[in-house]
Amino acid sequence: MDGIIEQKSMLVHSKISDAGKRNGLINTRNLMAESRDGLVSVYPAPQYQSHRVGASTVPASLDSSRSEPVQQLLDPNTLQQSVESRYRPNIILYSEGVLRSWGDGVTTDCCETTFIEDRSPTKDSLEYPDGKFIDLSADDIKIHTLSYDVEEEEEFQELESDYSSDTESEDNFLMMPPRDHLGLSVFSMLCCFWPLGIAAFYLSHETNKAVAKGDLHQASTSSRRALFLAVLSITIGTGVYVGVAVALIAYLSKNNHL
């Protein structure tokens, strides 16, 4: 009875190990580690160390019963070394044929990633959402450009030049000494209302004296006063002359009527 149970357990473990080999993955559900001598339990607990496991050392068909399975005791000292030597953590590399057989055998337990080269669109082609490419020639590629003239810079330069010329003229005017208006004062004194003309002539002399002393403020004040008095003298004189002429004409016309 014990022999039948052991044979059934051996068959179950061999099927599980064959499935693990076919899948190419480490079977974490299998609690037995396969070594060269047979199946060894991987339980580290001491209560499982006395359990015996039987396995066949030479592969044979199921119907042949020439030899009984060789039974061996579990050696806890060699257990860790045998497991580490067989299932060492490392990068596992498989050939393309093995991967293809895995994909054909079990499609739900593993997946395959395929890299396809030369699928990137070239510089003269466009890719559509459906994965198709369309080639573009040099004549089909058109770049729409927009050009316009910039005239604001020239206008800004013109305004800047005008502003600079105005500022230079103002600076030159401020740096110029005040004028004495001597000729206008003499004309107003001799030909127009002479009292205001004499005052304008006097202020023109005061302007020249202030300029000679370097007192530009006093010189400008005297110059403005001289100009004002000269213009006022000419205005009053012109009015006097016009009034005298009108009175003379009226008097002569009155005498002619008499």
UniProtKB/Swiss-Prot annotation:
Topology Cytoplasmic: residue spans: 1-181
Pfam entry (one): CD225
Membrane-crossing residue ranges in chain numbering: 182-202
Keywords assigned by UniProt, alphabetized: Cell membrane, Cell projection, Endosome, Membrane, Phosphoprotein, Postsynaptic cell membrane, Signal-anchor, Synapse, Transmembrane, Transmembrane helix
Membrane topology: Single-pass type II membrane protein
Localization per Swiss-Prot or TrEMBL: Cell membrane; Early endosome membrane; Postsynaptic density membrane; Synapse
Chief location bin: membrane
A GO term, aspect molecular function: glutamate receptor binding
Disulfide pairings: none
Keyword Transmembrane included in the entry's annotation: yes
A biological-process GO annotation: positive regulation of synapse assembly
UniProt cross-references to InterPro entries, sorted A to Z: CD225/Dispanin_fam
Cellular component terms (Gene Ontology): cell body; dendritic shaft; dendritic spine; early endosome membrane; excitatory synapse; plasma membrane; postsynaptic density; postsynaptic density membrane
Residue numbers on the Extracellular membrane side: 203-228, 250-258
Modified residues (Phosphoserine): 137
Keyword match tRNA-binding: no
Subunit note: Homodimer. Interacts with GRIA1 and GRIA2.
Function: May regulate AMPA receptor content at nascent synapses, and have a role in postsynaptic development and maturation.
Name of this protein: Synapse differentiation-inducing gene protein 1
Organism: Macaca fascicularis (Crab-eating macaque)
